[in-house]
Amino acid sequence: MIRRIVTDRGDSGQRLDLVFRRHLADLKGATRTQVQAWILDGAVTVNGRGVLRTAARVAAGDVLTVDLPAGVVTTRTAMPAQELALVTLYEDEHLIAINKPPGLVVHPTYRHPEGTVMNALLWQARGWRESDRPSMVNRLDKLTSGIVIGAKTARAHAAMQRALAGDRAAKEYLALVYGRVVRARGTIDLRIRRDPGDRRRVVASSGGAPSVTHWERLGRGRAEAAGLTLLKCRLVTGRTHQIRVHLAASGWPLVGDAKYGQPLWRDIADADLRESLRAFPRQALHAWRLAVTHPMTGATLRIEAPPPADLHRLLTAAGLVQCAR
């Protein structure tokens, strides 16, 4: 049996064996060692060409195939369809947009085999055409909230990935950061790459991939919340952890970012707000708005995801909620 995978931007720059391991999480026995064996045995292609290097790097939009042995196919566990309370922001015969809450994983992994956005998409797909095959077009970090796009067909998936590439789509995020940002707007042009010492982190590096983020100041915290700024960030490139790393490198770490931030809540004057900031359990980052040419119809598609309750409460306490409208 041939399994076909279209990589997304979250896979860009990753090792081939690790990408297969993530996308084959629904297969029993598809360990990293087993995946590497399939690659070395010539069972894998990338964009139609055989690849024998387990450490080969993939790019977003690559088409991967693996010829699975019969023994693996017979032990396959189907990805379960699960009814989850998700808000649909947009839907047509080709695409669906969902407002992902914080704490929810987009696609099943070894650690999160169920309870993901993809499981919920399969549940909704029960009412679609029999020929439709749901898939996720983009991803967000587990603790980042906001817009994620699903496709109903392989053709729509590939077309939407192309539409979202580069600066052809306006992808805007809300980011609550520590620091009083003085300028009204600016651009962060900083190369980033995986940290060689910790592959779960991304660092600024002259040898990294080009990464560009435009930002605009939406508002600064009231007097008691001095030291907080709400930014709108627009991605030109879409690297893993790009906004988080770019803002931290600029001296404006995201509130709640345990990986790249600092405990700057101590500098906030208001005691109640200070405690709310200390206890905020995630990075204060939200995929807010998307404007893109619909790849199947040619119409302009505009989608907006209201901030979730936890971020709304924090913005209200800081006197910034009106800036996120």
Regions inferred by a protein language model and the residue ranges of each:
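Pseudouridine synthase
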Residues: 113-121, 152-154, 194, 225-292, ...
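RNA pseudouridine synthases
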Residues: 1-199, 222-224, 306-325
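Short coil-to-beta-strand transition motifs
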Residues: 79-83, 204-213, 284-285
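Structural motif
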Residues: 62-63, 239, 299
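Short Gly/Pro-enriched turn/cap motifs at secondary-structure boundaries
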Residues: 138-139, 203-207, 279-282
